[in-house]
Regions:
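Short, conserved, GDST-rich strand-edge loop motifs in beta-rich repeat architectures
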Residues: 25-32, 145-165, 252-287, 340
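Asp-box/WD-like beta-propeller blade repeats and closely related beta-sheet repeat scaffolds
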Residues: 77-81, 98-161, 167-168
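Surface loop/turn motifs at the tips and blade-to-blade linkers of beta-strand repeat domains
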Residues: 54-59, 76-79, 117-127, 182-188, ...
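Loop/turn-rich, solvent-exposed surfaces of beta-rich toroidal or solenoidal domains
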Residues: 233-311
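Short loop/turn segments that connect beta-strands within beta-propeller blades
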Residues: 108-112, 174-178, 216-221, 297-301, ...
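Blade/loop signatures of beta-propeller domains
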Residues: 14-53, 164, 290-299
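Residue-level detector of Asp-centered blade-edge/turn motifs that repeat once per structural unit
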Residues: 68-72, 88-92, 137-140, 197-199, ...
Length: 345
């Protein structure tokens, strides 16, 4: 009887492994190194995020990104796809939106008129934009934006992450001329974008690589790229300026040895797991319920961190930090509230 059960189980695994197609094609992520971080120094465990106030709880779902006008007006729009990044144009009039399904949009908050600037089908070199994610705008009106994957769409983000997909792109859309330019490709889940205060380089988040790249858009290094910071203690989402002159990085998930094994190593095992489990559930299961945001200086060093180790108030899934000098506002791609954390008592 026991032998029959064992044989049946082995037969099941044989069928799954050899005959059932996998929805992903996992690769060994060997171009970057991950080490389980030590929570010491600027990463010393604290509970600062437990002081966060929940705004609009139950009235919003997945408030991924924020943009603030000169009046501080709160607006809700229902007619959209999945906006993942927002910035006001340099005139402070129109809101430019990176929408995962509709591409780049221009929204007039006063008239509520929505204009499609760059539909996903436009693409580049025959590859449509499958997953427009985040953006920033320079003084000339050029929109720098990321396309997280040339293969997967937003509702398939877990598949891109689990697979180790490196088809992400950094693009420049020159509004004045209508020219579209490829700046970087081969990115591991390209995510947040931030122009430096000097305007000479961009910081581009590679979510699945747990690192941030620097790409020069001006000066003698124009067109070159380098690592700004790597081996972050989790998976970074968006990056925004801090009031102290550095940058805030929202961490969507804290890194552990378990999710390292699950997401980075053993491609054949990941291939098998993708056949057996629902990947969005599996990826969520891999991450601890831990809220974390980081402040970086201009050189990419972590200067401080705010944490919620138990996830009792801010349960991870943080997508963006907006700093107005007195308050941090925390966005999320999954939570049903917008976080508000007072910086000064």
């Amino acid at each position: 009887m026991f032998a029959s059960v064992v044989l049946l189980i082995l037969s099941f695994f044989d069928v799954v492994f050899f005959f059932i197609p996998s929805p992903v094609d996992p690769i060994l992520n060997s171009t970057f190194e991950k080490k389980t971080p030590k929570f010491e120094g600027a990463l010393k465990v604290n509970s600062m995020l437990t002081k966060t106030e929940r705004l609009f709880e139950g009235k919003v779902f997945g408030p991924e990104s924020m943009a603030v006008d000169s009046k501080g007006t709160v607006e809700f729009w229902s007619k959209c796809g999945r906006p993942l990044g927002m910035r006001f144009d340099r005139n402070g009039i129109n809101l430019i939106v990176a929408d995962a399904y509709f591409g780049l949009l221009e929204v007039n908050p006063e008239t509520k008129v929505v204009k499609i600037l760059l539909p996903p089908a436009t693409g580049f070199n025959g590859k449509p934009f499958r997953f427009v994610n985040h953006l920033d705008i320079d003084e000339d009106g050029t929109i720098f934006f990321t396309d997280s994957s040339a293969k997967w769409q937003a509702h398939q983000a877990s598949y891109s992450f689990f697979e180790g997909d490196k088809t992400g792109r950094l693009m420049a859309y020159h509004l004045k001329t209508g020219e579209l330019e490829l700046l970087m490709d081969g990115l591991y889940f390209a995510n947040g974008v931030q122009i430096s205060p000097e305007g000479d380089h961009l910081l581009v988040v590679e979510y699945a690589a747990s690192r941030i790249m620097k790409y020069y858009i001006k000066g003698e290094n124009k067109g070159k790229s380098e690592v700004f910071v790597e081996n972050l203690p989790g998976y970074p989402d968006n990056i925004r300026p801090s009031s102290s002159g550095g940058y805030w990085v929202a961490m969507s998930m804290v890194f552990t040895e378990f999710n390292d094994m699950l997401m980075y190593s053993y491609p054949r095992a990941r291939n098998f797991l993708a056949k057996v489990f629902y990947l969005p559930w599996l990826v969520n299961f891999a991450g601890p319920n831990y809220g974390l945001i980081l402040e970086l200086d201009r050189n990419g060093h972590i200067t401080r961190s705010f944490q919620d180790p138990t996830g009792s108030v801010v349960p991870g899934h943080i997508s963006e930090v907006y700093d107005d000098g007195n308050v941090l506002y925390l966005g999320s791609y999954q939570s049903s509230f917008l976080g508000k954390l007072e910086l000064k008592d």
